[in-house]
Amino acid sequence: MNLKNNTDQIKRDLITGSRRLSNYWWAITIGLGSSGFILAGISSYTKINLLPFTDTTQFLFIPQGITMLLYGTIGFLLDIYLWLLILWNVGAGYNEYNKKKGTVSIFRWGFPGTNRRIEVIYPIEQIQAIKLEIKQGLNPRHSISLKIQEKNEIVITPIGYLLPISVVEEQAANLASFLNIPLDSNQ
């Protein structure tokens, strides 16, 4: 979480969405790999070598060429999906804690359509506690949640980031101190 626009009355945490370095890496890698598979499949059908670093004209179109063409097409569709996620910046947004208005606002960008803008606003009085959850093991999880009265918990840490425990603990303690709300730790 990036911190920006913080004063003694307003605290805003910016959330990075799909425009992460890892998503750019995977989009480029899958795009290059799927292009290679598609060109290999077409080369095996036309018997014209379209890949300069290997001779794929020796493959039989059925079954090797058509299989490579199928894998390349699936990879290309996945690549388009990743680039659209990056373009739309799905998951980006902010968490704003406004003591002046007495509200907590959680905003995220979603997929295009009627619900592209996802925003929930709660009065600070409805927040019972800041919950810190730390799980170790094969699927570790370090997250901060808002415990809302008569509602579910709302996770406010970005998904896909595994911050060090000390950083998550410090963020949770700072938020609890800022909102003057108890910190509930589940370790």
Swiss-Prot record:
One biological process term in Gene Ontology: photosynthesis
How would you describe this protein's topology in the membrane? Answer: Multi-pass membrane protein
Q: Which GO terms describe its cellular component?
A: cyanelle thylakoid membrane; photosystem I
Q: Is the keyword Transmembrane helix in the record?
A: yes
Q: Give the keywords, sorted.
A: Cyanelle, Membrane, Photosynthesis, Plastid, Thylakoid, Transmembrane, Transmembrane helix
Subcellular location field: Plastid, Cyanelle thylakoid membrane
Residue intervals passing through the bilayer: 21-43, 69-91
What function is annotated for this protein?
A: Seems to be required for the assembly of the photosystem I complex.
Family (UniProt): Belongs to the Ycf4 family.
What's this protein's name? Photosystem I assembly protein Ycf4
Name the gene for this chain: ycf4
